[in-house]
């Protein structure tokens, strides 16, 4: 008879215990994730908007939009403003192209006027904070701002720009997005409130 004092048996017992713990944790995380998703909650892991939990809302089709909603949307490399830009999205089957959606706050709606310049993004005469453009991302890849100018937001269009992160890859680089690309409308539910400068462009 071999007792638990046997080194090999003890080692196997410890490994089995750890494996059981990992399995329990994995099932717990999956259960919580499915429960939150079923209740209309979405978790944001990116750095361009506050990290944390967002609550899904109905499509806010009419103004006033207070507080401004956020959107999860699926970009398309065929959009004029997306051609030649780096792809920061993680592989995922959520969007038709096999990558994860982006999450950004909506700052301009049909009928609004957007002006882009070297000073940043202005909506209806109000300059948005942290919207200066850069010519290279955090990894050193070239990145081009959307053509500077004044734009009247057309029906079926939205402008999505994050003031939370000066490194956000958003409409300041790819311009307006089609409203039909939106997968979810959300509002912050339980999120961080401070930007971390070391975060990468996403």
Where would I find each of the regions flagged by the language model?
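Extended hydrophobic leader/signal-anchor segments used for secretion and membrane insertion
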Residues: 2-202
